[in-house]
């Protein structure tokens, strides 16, 4: 799945690791992800779409760290991201030193549901990235300019909201929400 990176997505900090590759590549990728200080480790089901997935399909363990959102990041997020990279390099024995301590005890997310908009219109989300959700809960509505509901986005499973569009404008076939299914959300540290 190819997904154009947007600057209108709100996301919680998490890390993708290669999941559609040889077992040893997946194992090494997950081990790399485990040294990143985020609440969730997300196993990617894709073998293409993004450089980290392509690397995995070529036998190269890889991860994608998601931190910051809407094209904005704080100094703290930059420092956390840099420390994450240093920890991965330490794990790989490319950089000397001990892997630094972590704030989070990450939860595994192996099944992610990606929902794209079926209509162009105005998006009204009901949740925030990092919120837990229950199957059947309304995650948001797409309305026209007159307030008529064009689409209702409903959670297909219990889980945690990884990211969502937060702009008023939403485009047909564009990303709307992504959430991890059946996650033991009680174990997730709030970021």
Describe each model-derived feature in a short phrase.
Residues 1-191:
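Structured catalytic-domain cores with a bias toward divalent-metal coordination
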């Amino acid at each position: 799945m190819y997904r154009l990176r947007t600057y209108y997505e709100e996301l919680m900090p998490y890390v993708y690791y290669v999941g559609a590759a040889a077992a040893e590549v997946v194992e090494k990728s997950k081990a790399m992800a485990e040294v990143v200080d985020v609440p969730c480790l997300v196993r990617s089901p894709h073998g293409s779409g993004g450089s980290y997935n392509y690397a995995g399909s070529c036998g190269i363990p890889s991860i994608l760290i998601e931190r910051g959102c809407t094209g904005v990041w704080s100094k703290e997020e930059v420092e956390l991201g840099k420390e994450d990279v240093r920890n991965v390099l330490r794990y790989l024995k490319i950089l000397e030193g001990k892997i630094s301590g972590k704030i989070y005890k990450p939860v595994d997310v192996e099944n992610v549901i990606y929902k794209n908009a079926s209509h162009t219109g105005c998006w009204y989300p009901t949740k925030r990235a990092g919120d837990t959700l229950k199957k059947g809960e309304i995650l948001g509505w797409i309305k026209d300019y007159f307030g008529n509901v064009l689409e209702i986005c409903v959670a297909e499973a219990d889980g945690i909201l990884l990211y969502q569009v937060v702009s008023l404008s939403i485009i047909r076939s564009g990303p709307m929400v992504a959430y991890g299914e059946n996650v033991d959300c009680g174990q997730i540290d709030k970021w």
